[in-house]
Amino acid sequence: METVSTQRETASSETERTREAASAETTDATFRSLEEGSTISSRYSETASTASEDAVCWLRRTAIVMRVYGLLTLETAFSVLISALVWLGYPSLGYECRDDPSPLLLSCTPVLVLGALELTDHRHPSNGLVFALYVALLSFTTAGLNLCATAPIGVSSLILTWTLFVACNGVAWEHRLSSVWRDALFTSTLLTVMVSVLASTYTWLHKTLLCLYTVFVGCILAVLFQDVRYIATKMPVSHIIRSSLVLYATETLIYHTTLLMLTPVVWSARWDQMFSYLAKLGTYHHYRVDNGTLSVILNSTTATFQSRVA
C-alpha cells in the first residue's frame, strides 16, 4: 500500500512539474510574441516615419525644382519675345556680318555670364535685381546676334537648341540609368555625329567646323548635366535664382553657337574689317552734320547780305 501511495505521489508531482513547465513555456512564448510584436510595431513606426520624412523631402525638392524651371521658362519666353519683336517690328533692319563681323562678339556674353555665376558660386548675389540684369543682358545680346541671320535660321537654331537641352535634362533626371550607361550613351552619340559629319559630302572646311561645333556643344551638355544633377539633389533654396540663370545662360550659349553654325555668312566673314560698318555710320553722320552746319551758315550769311542791300 505504501508503495502504491508513493507511486501516486510521484506521478502527481511529475504531473505538476509538467504542468508548471508547460505554463512556463507558454508564458515565455507569450512574452516572446509580445516582444516580437513590439519590435515589429517599432520597426513599422520607424519605416512609416522614414517614409513620411522621405515624402516631405521629395515634396520640398520638387517645389524647388519647379521654381527653378519656372524661372527658366520665364527667361526663355522673354528672350524669344524680344527677338520676335526685333524681327517682326523691324523687318528691314539687318547687318552685313560678312563685311563687318563685330556683332559676332555678342556670342561671348553667355560665356562671361556663366563664368561670373560659376566662379563666384556662393558669393554671387541672388536677388531680383541680378535676375533682371542678367536676363536683359542675354536677351538683348541674343536679339543683336539675330541680326546676322534670317528668321528661318533663327527658328531652326531655337528648335535644335531646345531638343538638345531637353534631351540632356531628361538623361540627367533618369535615376534608373547608371553612370556607366550615361557615359556610354553620351560618348556613342558624340562619336556617331562626328563620324556622320566626316562621312558627308561637305568640304573639309565645313567638316572641320561641324566637328568643332559637335565637340563644343558636347562639352556644354556635359557641364549642363552636372548642373541639372546638382539642382535635382543638393541645391539649397537660396540658389534658386542663380541656378535658373545658369541653365538660362547655358541654353543661350547653345543657341548662339548653333545660330553661328547654321549661318553661312559667318563662315566667310572678313575679320580684318571689324567695326568697319560702325565707322562708316560715324563718317556718314559726321558728313551730314557738317553739311547741315554749312548750310545754316550760308543761309544766315545770305540773309544778312540781303538785309544790308535792302
UniProtKB/Swiss-Prot annotation:
One of its GO terms (cellular component) is membrane. It is a multi-pass membrane protein. It is found in: Host membrane. Residues 1-13 have a biased composition (Low complexity). Keywords: Host membrane, Membrane, Transmembrane, Transmembrane helix. Residues 1-28 are annotated as: Disordered. The keyword Endoplasmic reticulum does not apply. The chain crosses the membrane at residues 68-88, 100-120, 125-145, 147-167, 185-205, 208-228, 246-266. It comes from the Viruses. Belongs to the cytomegalovirus US12 family. This is Membrane protein US14. It comes from Human cytomegalovirus (strain Merlin) (HHV-5).
